[in-house]
């Protein structure tokens, strides 16, 4: 019969065998026999089994040099570690709620009548991908350079992919934690999606919104005809970020809402100038001015009567015609500010 002191000496001697970098000695290639590498996901349970036979007098499971169980006696203070079986043929333990710090080598050590023998198994802990740091939503001016960051953790290390979610079909994919955009354009605004993938679980996906500011551009401003006594409506549509503010002028006079039978309504990209009862004096050239913090632009629009000769082109085709008038209007705007 073995004295307890002998067992202590045995375990201490066995522990010396597991110095990092030193191969584990094993007297018999088939005894004891532990499992191959065990792979589990973070949060799951891991079962470590060791096959033994009736030659075994003492058994123990160790994590590196720390004894977890010696026979039925628990040495570990970790309540997640429990013994499953201690029979003549198998000695196994279970680790509940496995975490990344549980990863590493585990050793089944046995004492026979002759000498200690060991067998090792490596526990691999897989961790689902998780994005741990990502850029906040950002607003920049057109032409600026932008860097978006998306840092992810997981085991195996996840692959990080950036994708532009564009409704115009101009989306692109970049496989890197950092996405760099040089000279950003208004078409590159919108949501950017970061995905972290490692095949352990579903990808972790998060989004960043990129807003690109740009000066106003008048996209629609058409001449309009109306008879005396009828309603006439001039429309001016401008694209801009931030949204443009509109002003209306006749020649060099700024029009005020509600005066002289006109109403000015501006909502989003569209501004309208409405004449409720058109008179002869209302006919003529009007200028729509769209302004935001990055700049301004203007378009000339004509309200004409029946039979009048007019240019029905859009705002772009009439830009040169309004140049002199715009110089006058700009001077007036500067005085107003």
Curated annotation (Swiss-Prot):
Its main location: membrane. Pfam families: I-set, Ig_3. It is a lipid-anchor; GPI-anchor. GO terms for cellular component: plasma membrane; side of membrane. A lipid is attached at residue 314 (GPI-anchor amidated asparagine). Restricted to the nervous system. Transmembrane segments: none annotated. Residues 32-119, 129-211, 215-302 form the Ig-like C2-type domain. Keywords: Cell adhesion, Cell membrane, Disulfide bond, Glycoprotein, GPI-anchor, Immunoglobulin domain, Lipoprotein, Membrane, Repeat, Signal. Glycans are attached at residues 133, 277, 285, 298. PROSITE patterns: IG_LIKE. One of its GO terms (biological process) is cell adhesion. Disulfide bonds join 50-108, 150-194, 236-288. It is found in: Cell membrane. Inhibits neurite outgrowth. This is Opioid-binding protein/cell adhesion molecule homolog. It comes from Gallus gallus (Chicken).
